[in-house]
Amino acid sequence: GINDEAIARAVDGWDVITTPLNDVRRIGGFSNLKQHWDADEHLRLKDLRHMYDILCTRHPDYKVDADAVLNGRTAAFCNMFIMRKEIFFEYNEWLFPLLDEFADATDFSKMDVQTTRTVGHLSERLLNIFIAHKQRTGAHWKIKRMQCVHFLRPDPMTTLEPLGTEYGRVVPVVFAADNNYVPMLATTIYSMLKN
């Protein structure tokens, strides 16, 4: 069963845990991740190219890894991962300036709801590029790939009460999602509340 002890056993000793690597040839016969991106009617190749340019300008040493990942056939999708704290902080310090620069230069006002999720799709690709770069440059992280679980009947929901001032500054967090992302949102919200 899934309980605290089982989860601790599953994650103990690993530096990074992600969803399994999916081969885009099996998802839809795509030859690489760029083609996979371009086939999605809600994603624009110009956005992927813009992020690539931002990444290569800010971090030229990542170009070889971006090329390998985007021209490659496999990636961990769903933006779901567990990392050692110091790796997580390093990843966020690297990731969010890239996403911020992209978002600042992008007009979201004429996008449909799904296309406004482009930043999330970009961050999926960036996770793979970050890991590829770190492994290529000698991080030697122990990486585990675990299946993504979709809970059909999670435990009954508890009623959430508004946070009082005893918690200090309260920061609202907003997600753009539909019913397909409820499991991921529930996990994210639970993690934020606990940490």
Q: Residue ranges of each PLM-predicted region?
A:
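N-terminal anchoring/stem segment of glycosyltransferases
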Residues: 157-195
